[in-house]
UniProtKB/Swiss-Prot annotation:
One GO process term, biological-process aspect: RNA splicing
Stated name of the protein: Nuclear cap-binding protein subunit 1
Biased segments, Basic and acidic residues type: 1-14
Family: Belongs to the NCBP1 family.
Gene Ontology terms, MF aspect: RNA cap binding
Pfam families, A to Z: MIF4G, MIF4G_like, MIF4G_like_2
Sequence ranges assigned to domain MIF4G in this UniProt record: 28-240
Organism listed in the record: Xenopus tropicalis (Western clawed frog)
Annotated keywords: Coiled coil, Cytoplasm, mRNA capping, mRNA processing, mRNA splicing, mRNA transport, Nonsense-mediated mRNA decay, Nucleus, RNA-mediated gene silencing, Translation regulation, Transport
Subcellular location: Nucleus; Cytoplasm
Length: 791
């Protein structure tokens, strides 16, 4: 009996201790949950929730102050759509505990400086805005906020800095004024007028060469595509004219005015913006996306005008929701649809415009394209009675404006629309788009419909497309995705290499070895054997043609069959692709046999790069070759090129990462050696690591050289074909601005935009070798616009 009691005590002891040690963690988790979820669905009002939470936090401050500070600083960055809820909470805590309010303000300033140094400028904007709203909650004194704004605007006077640095500090000030402008003007109107005058002077002298490369549409009608600072400035000017009155910001602190106005306020410490360094990377400028106005939503609430600050506030809050919840499409969709004050605005129109604005954002969308697709599908499920109609209206608008739409954005529109249709049984009223049938096939509308059908086929099958799209569209139907094996028909028996192709077919079917295959191929005569060029003698195009055509036709049943064939006969491919011409000819043959199946071409080229049968430069040269001129404007061609560039970039990054890791290992080894003076072996251990670092350094330099060469090849080819077009038009008295020219020039822009961070490294080389002052201004302007993105 006593033994059992003793056992019970032993069991209870450790369990009791574990519970005690876990209690603080449980309380911290509970505090985090309470803070993060305040203002969400609740039976009681937001005000009573805030008051209750302030009481709970005040009681926990003695034991959990640092944790509460961390959580509040974190939500200021990560949940900006609930900013005014959290500023009110901080205001209530400051009214109850002045010291805590001071510590919170100090912590926020520290976070702001760290965030700027880390180049996290989007989050830094939220922190600035949060500090501004604390002025409304009587936590921060208005004069010290004005002083911070003065230091921000002072950046515009700095010398030898990129314009994008000044842009960000001006944006941080202007974008905060909808929340705090009224309060600051009441307290410091003279100083605020001076700040706005400085901003106006800065905006007038800014260069805006970058605008056209970032616009979704080249036409200014029906909606101007304004530069973001110009648009925001117009909105703030109108807000000032309206005496800083706005009607869309949730301001829960107004309910606590009698409590908050009694609180003591804190002065912000003098703020010096962190200086510009070589490592500073500022946000790229933007163009404001406009798709709808009040005429597009005739029923229900009126959509605010483009220069109304309410339009900015609504869009900014919706962007914040997307940033906070993009990883969870269901949560994100629900949050968007439960937007506060949603009954006062045409919410569905705002949501669709904001989502398309992000999807079409140049240089790149904030998130993966597929995120926006799945989010719109989720929104349609949650609002089946209204949102699909708005989305159909938007699709129709986008289609009607294809002639002036940027080619990069047309690509994204194709991807989204085809993916969206695949989730709704490919239902669409194709007759509404029959106007494209009377246009030349190289025009944007027929090209768009053709590419959409091609993409839809990838997501279903060929016959399905023929069944759902009217026969009137047959000229735009995708080709039947079958291979074209020229040695498969006896009527072609007179073709050179035909008999070898038959023998090769039988040998592969009978599982012949590589040696046996080589023996069959050696009998193929070389059409280049009379050439004087040594490389011409070793390069046999007919041998490549017979082998690649035969093998790929036998493996044509599926992607996996083709992949297996490449793997099984990899050594033969490597032997045939020893020369640059050999690599290029393999790609030509892949195109010849699979010209009716663009997706197969794309996956085979991808696999050949991965298995080093061909290299990235060969793919670039092939894409610009005369054999592909017919398909040059096609979507899949650029899909292949960008995939090739990404592979090269990832290869370089992988080796750079290996080098950095190795250097860290060596540094740790040195640190360990310094702390252990008696270790005589440590010096000997450095040797192998240093040798590995040296080898990796050489690999990095070699990979970067390949990367630079790839971009040089691509840009050189662009310059050549664009120059040929311009000369041809000039000598023939033809208008330069053809559909082909628009497409090609915008594809050049796409290379710059999609890979801008990598290309920045090679700017000097590009400027010295290719984009020189002598180049035609039609081409040179694209390079200058790109340079302006970070200047």
């Amino acid at each position: 009996m006593s033994r059992r009691r003793h056992s019970d005590e032993n069991d209870g002891g450790p369990h009791h201790k574990r519970r005690k040690t876990s209690e603080p963690l449980e309380i911290e988790d509970r505090l985090e949950s309470l803070i993060c979820r305040v203002g969400e669905k609740s039976t009681s009002s937001l005000e009573s929730n805030l008051e209750g939470l302030a009481g709970v936090l005040e009681a926990d401050l003695p034991n959990y102050k640092s944790k509460i500070l961390r959580i509040l600083c974190s939500v200021a960055r990560t949940l900006p759509e609930k900013m005014t809820v959290y500023t009110t909470l901080v205001g209530l805590l400051n009214a109850r505990n002045y010291n805590f309010g001071g510590e919170f303000v100090e912590a926020m300033i520290r976070h702001l400086k760290e965030t700027i140094k880390l180049n996290a400028y989007n989050e830094a904007v939220y922190l600035v805005r949060f500090l501004c709203d604390l002025v409304n909650c009587h936590v921060i004194a208005a004069p010290s906020m004005v002083a911070m704004f003065e230091s921000f605007v002072g950046v515009t006077q700095e010398e030898d800095i990129p314009q994008v640095r000044s842009d960000w500090y001006v944006y941080a000030v202007l974008s905060s004024l909808p929340w705090v402008g009224k309060e600051l003007y009441e307290k410091k109107d003279v100083e605020m007028d001076r700040i706005l005058s400085q901003i106006e002077a800065y905006l007038k002298q800014r260069q805006k060469l970058h605008v056209s490369i970032l616009q979704v549409w080249s036409a200014e009608k029906p909606h101007p595509q304004e530069e973001y600072l110009d648009c925001l400035w117009a909105q703030i000017q109108k807000l000032k004219k309206d005496r800083w009155q706005e009607r869309h910001i949730l301001r829960p602190y107004l309910a606590f005015d009698s409590v908050l106005c009694e609180a003591l306020q804190h002065n912000l410490p003098p703020f010096t913006p962190p200086p510009h360094t070589e490592d500073s990377v500022y946000p790229v400028p933007r163009v404001v996306f406009r798709m709808f106005d009040y005429t597009d939503a005739p029923e229900g609430p009126v959509m605010p005008g483009s220069h109304s600050v309410e339009r900015f506030v609504i869009e900014e809050n919706l962007h914040c929701i997307l940033r906070s919840h993009w990883r969870e499409r269901k949560t994100c969709a629900a949050q968007l649809l439960s937007y506060p004050e949603k009954n006062k605005i045409p919410l569905n129109y705002h949501i669709v415009e904001v989502i398309f604005g992000e999807l079409f954002q140049l240089p790149n969308p904030p998130h993966l394209d597929v995120m926006y697709t799945t989010l719109l599908i989720e929104l349609c499920k949650l609002q089946p009675g209204s949102l699909p109609q708005v989305l159909a209206q938007a699709s129709e608008m986008l289609y009607t404006r294809l002639d002036t739409m940027n080619t990069i954005c047309i690509d994204r529109f194709i991807n989204w629309f085809s993916h969206h249709l695949s989730n709704f049984q490919f239902r669409w009223n194709w007759e509404d788009w029959s106007d494209c049938l009377s246009q030349d096939l190289d025009k944007p509308k027929p090209q768009f419909v053709r590419e959409v059908l091609e993409k839809c086929m990838r997501l279903s099958y060929h016959q399905r497309i023929l069944d759902i799209v009217p026969a009137a569209f047959s000229a735009l139907y995708p080709a039947s995705p079958s291979c074209v094996f020229k040695y498969g028909d006896e009527s072609n028996s007179a073709l050179p290499g035909y008999s070898v192709a038959v023998a090769l077919t039988n040998a592969i079917k009978n599982k012949a070895s590589d040696k046996e295959i080589f023996n069959i191929l050696k009998d193929i005569p070389n059409p280049n054997q009379d050439d004087d060029d040594d490389e011409g003698i070793s390069f046999n195009p007919l041998k490549i043609e017979v082998f690649v055509q035969t093998l790929l036709s036998l493996a044509s049943k599926s992607f996996s069959h083709s992949f297996s064939a490449l793997a099984k006969f990899h050594d033969i491919f490597k032997a045939l692709s020893e020369s640059d011409e050999g690599k290029l000819h393999i790609l030509r043959v892949v195109y010849d046999i699979w010209k009716n199946h663009p997706q197969m071409i794309a996956v085979l080229v991808d696999k050949m790069i991965r298995t080093q049968i061909v290299d990235c430069a060969a793919v670039a040269n092939w894409i610009f070759s005369p054999e592909l001129s017919r398909d040059f404007p096609r979507f899949y061609i650029w899909e292949i090129l960008h995939s090739t560039i990404r592979k090269m970039n990832k290869h370089v990054q992988k080796i750079q990462k290996e080098l950095e890791d190795m250097k860290l290992r060596l540094a740790k080894q040195h640190k360990h050696r310094d702390s252990d003076d008696n270790d005589e072996d440590s010096g000997r251990k450095d040797g192998p690591l240093e040798e590995q670092i040296e080898r990796l350094q050489e690999k990095v330099e070699s990979a970067q050289s390949e990367q630079k060469n790839l971009f040089l090849v691509i840009f050189q080819r662009f310059i050549m074909i664009l120059t040929e077009h311009l000369v041809r038009c000039e000598t023939g008295g033809i208008d330069v601005n053809t559909a082909w020219y628009k497409n090609c020039r915008e594809r050049l822009q796409q290379i710059f935009l999609q890979h801008h961070q990598i290309i920045q490294q090679y700017m000097v080389t590009l400027e010295n070798l290719l984009f020189t002052a002598e180049l035609d201004h039609h081409i040179l302007t694209v390079f200058q616009q790109f340079c302006a993105l970070q200047s």
